[in-house]
């Protein structure tokens, strides 16, 4: 067997990087790549924000509207949840709720950078909305309005968990024409070391598993970012 053949059959390819007088493994390079991607996205969102971004995405947004209206019609007023939970050390649920209310108590984030940068797929806050977002949901670019939900339909409120007594936010998500298509139910409870947090988005029951699973991951990225923002604000 030749040396080349032996190398090819010896197992997976790994890479070490030698630079700046040090050696780095691939996990470090992955982190550098992630940081670079975040910088690139931040630059793009800054340069092509607002109505410019809305115009660029218009066709995709219209397709997203049609997708969600079809889900609503197929669901007949029934729902299912996407749910992600967090165990937080060093920040109480009460402090997180105070921060969240100060930022989004009206349904509109006060610090737009914290909203846009919480997730790579937060494309733009529609400039004519008092609160809202264009983001990827179910593989579709989705434009929605956010408003505080003072009252919840009984099938939605049934998802609230009384063992999490601290409310972060209850919100209604509506399509551009005012059609309700989802609800946010975000709760927490204090622990001896910090908090336990559970965040839910309640979707029409016809939402496919891939959409629910994708949004569970979306919530993990988004709320980890906001938990870190809240912790930084309390220091």
List PLM regions with ranges:
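Glycine-rich portal/gate segments that line the openings of hydrophobic small-molecule binding cavities
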Residues: 107-110, 114-176
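Surface-exposed beta-strand edges and their flanking turn/coil or helix-capping segments
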Residues: 99, 148-149, 210-214
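Histidine (H) residue identity feature
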Residues: 18, 60, 68, 119-122, ...
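Short, highly charged C-terminal tails/helix-capping segments
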Residues: 230-235
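Hydrophobic ligand-binding cavity/cleft-lining segments
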Residues: 35-127
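Beta-strand/loop substructures that line and gate deep hydrophobic ligand-binding cavities in soluble
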Residues: 2-44, 166-225
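Hydrophobic/aromatic beta-strand elements that line small-molecule binding cavities or substrate pockets
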Residues: 86, 148-150, 156, 182-190
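Generic detector of short, locally flexible boundary/turn motifs and exposed helical patches
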Residues: 17-22, 45-53, 61-63, 149-155, ...
């Amino acid at each position: 067997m030749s040396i080349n053949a032996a190398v090819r059959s010896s197992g997976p390819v790994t890479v070490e990087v030698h630079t700046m007088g040090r050696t780095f493994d691939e996990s470090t390079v992955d982190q550098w790549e992630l940081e670079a991607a975040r910088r690139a996205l931040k630059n793009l969102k800054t340069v092509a924000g607002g109505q410019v971004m809305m115009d660029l995405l218009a066709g995709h947004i219209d397709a997203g509207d049609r997708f969600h209206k079809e889900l609503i019609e197929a669901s007949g007023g029934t729902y299912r949840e996407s749910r992600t939970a967090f165990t937080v050390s060093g920040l109480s649920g009460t402090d997180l709720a105070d921060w969240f209310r100060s930022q989004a108590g009206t349904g509109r984030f006060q610090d737009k950078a914290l909203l846009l940068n919480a997730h790579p797929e937060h494309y733009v806050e529609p400039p004519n909305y008092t609160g809202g977002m264009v983001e990827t949901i179910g593989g579709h670019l989705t434009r929605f309005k956010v408003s505080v939900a003072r009252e919840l339909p009984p099938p939605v409120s049934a998802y609230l968990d009384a063992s999490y007594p601290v409310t972060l936010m209850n919100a209604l998500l509506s399509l551009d024409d005012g059609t309700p298509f989802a609800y946010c139910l975000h709760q927490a409870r204090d622990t001896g070391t910090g908090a336990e947090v559970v965040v839910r988005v309640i979707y029409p029951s016809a939402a496919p598993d891939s959409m629910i699973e994708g949004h569970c991951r979306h919530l993990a990225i988004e709320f980890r970012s906001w938990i870190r923002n809240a912790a930084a604000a309390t220091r």
